[in-house]
Amino acid sequence: MKKAPAGSFPAKPTIAPERPILVFDSGIGGLTVLREARVVMPDRRFVYIADDAGFPYGNWEEEALKRRIIELFGEFIANYDPEIAVIACNTASTLVLEDLRRAYPSVPFVGMVPAIKPAAERTSSGLVSVLATPGTVKRAYTRDLIQSFASRCHVRLVGADGLAAIAEAHIRGESFDEALVMAQIAPCFIEKDGKRTDIVVLACTHYPFLVNVLRRLAPWPVDWLDPAEAIARRMKSLLPARSDDDEFHSQDDLAFFTSRKPDYAIRRLMQGFGLRF
């Protein structure tokens, strides 16, 4: 297979460790999924991979991005032999999930898709907004979800072209202009026939890191729906059960960045999540 564009990877250990769960995102938003996965699977080993060399994915031409992710996973699978792989990125999941399953049939893949079905089940007003990247908004897959599960609701798709980058800045402790955040989320709030939007689906794993900011800036209270917990439960359901006699993993959880150059703030963040480089 052609060498992945992100550079060389660590050599595969000579003594095979416990097969990890691989959590992949374009940046650090997938940590929201990792956090929930550890709650439901504290005995499992994780490898977190951020394709920061390719971030943000919204700037990519679709076929080029698809090729990149498929090639990267060839390296990831060869080096880490994951028990399961989680695409903790809505943009990547809606673009390439099925291609990954075809390319690597021996690895179970779990993807992130907008939580439109639970939003439709939970809404009282029937007014639901989906806050996502422009790539997720324009995919036919997203519209198919609406047609299948939310046809009786008024669903507004809101493509936020800069919110993931703002979330990354926020996680790093950097300042940002809250007016930009307000401009990104304002289209989510609809008033119609005396009713208001009551659920906003967070259809990007970066956005939950901003949820306290979003709550404060919102013109009225809504349910900010984060699918990370449901994805973690789905991951667990695909793995073989462990008995009480099974030993917990002894290997460290790892973080790998495709740029090979995470800055100091990111390294501190990863260490705070108990991830070793």
UniProtKB/Swiss-Prot annotation:
Keywords in alphabetical order: Cell shape, Cell wall biogenesis/degradation, Isomerase, Peptidoglycan synthesis
Pathway(s) this gene product operates in, as recorded in its UniProt entry: Cell wall biogenesis; peptidoglycan biosynthesis
InterPro entries, per database record: Asp/Glu/hydantoin_racemase (IPR015942), Asp/Glu_race (IPR001920), Asp/Glu_racemase_AS_1 (IPR018187), Asp/Glu_racemase_AS_2 (IPR033134), Glu_race (IPR004391)
Active site per UniProt: C89, C204
Cross-referenced SUPFAM superfamilies: Aspartate/glutamate racemase
Matches recorded under Gene3D superfamilies: 3.40.50.1860
GO molecular function, one term: glutamate racemase activity
Top-rank taxon, per record: Bacteria
Gene Ontology biological process: cell wall organization; peptidoglycan biosynthetic process; regulation of cell shape
Reactions catalysed according to its record: L-glutamate = D-glutamate
Family of this protein: Belongs to the aspartate/glutamate racemases family.
Its job: Provides the (R)-glutamate required for cell wall biosynthesis.
The protein's name in its UniProt record: Glutamate racemase
